[in-house]
Amino acid sequence: MHPLWWRAAERLLATREGALSVTDRDGVRYILKTWWEGRECNIRDREECMEAMHLLAGLHKDLEFIPTFPEMEGIPTPVIRRFLPSREYEKHNKELKRARRFLKQRSQKTWFEIRLAAVMDPFLEEAGQICEEWKKIENSHDVEAGETFCFCHGDYQYHNILRQDRGFFLVNFEKCQADGPIRDLYLLLRKLLEKSDWDCNRGEALLAAYESVRPLNPFERQDLFYRLSYPEKLWKIVNFYYNSGKAWIPEKNQEKLDRLLEQETARKKFLRILRP
């Protein structure tokens, strides 16, 4: 790994015997990691957010690899497959439909439920259309031998990007896995755009910061577009509501729904700019 990114990320410390974990008598496994004191990346600070994008692109660039496995007689060659978001979002669509049926059958509705029921149909129609388009693109994308993967952080958001005197320090790699880089880029970009009311200028600047280090290929750009297009925020609101007690609905739910609807025009504007 490049020395710059090696210094900027937590590391597992090995035991004297070279093991990266130890297990106690109860079978509980422990690890020891490096750690630096610091504060979370300030999402209101444009320069810090740009630097976080540079760091992510550098991390992806240094951790890219092409899977190769030695051929062994009688043993099938392992295959590393990309995560296909359309499959997960198809599941989300079923959950949204289930919640919509529940709301339609519910006779006594709160103001939040009335408001939610009124907006679900257009969002659900959009979600279904996005999934269909996405599947066609995924199916037409040839996954050839020698395709490049990278090790993703898995949870690259400002909580895990610590600022200290020496610069940024990345922590909590527990969800690290081999996948496409858009897994990380989408998560951070969506969080920052939501916090800035989907400001187009800021979104373009953040994406340009990433691409100044590691340009996206055409498929990655499409992947990012469709991930950002899916109404995941609505699904989160609906999922939390449907799986919790309905006798009392937190005011926070209403606030999140109102904010989502207020940002929808700006979100659509940014997506028109991003569309490949």
What annotation goes with each model-predicted range?
Residues 12, 132-181:
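Active-site acidic catalytic loop and adjacent metal/ATP-binding pocket
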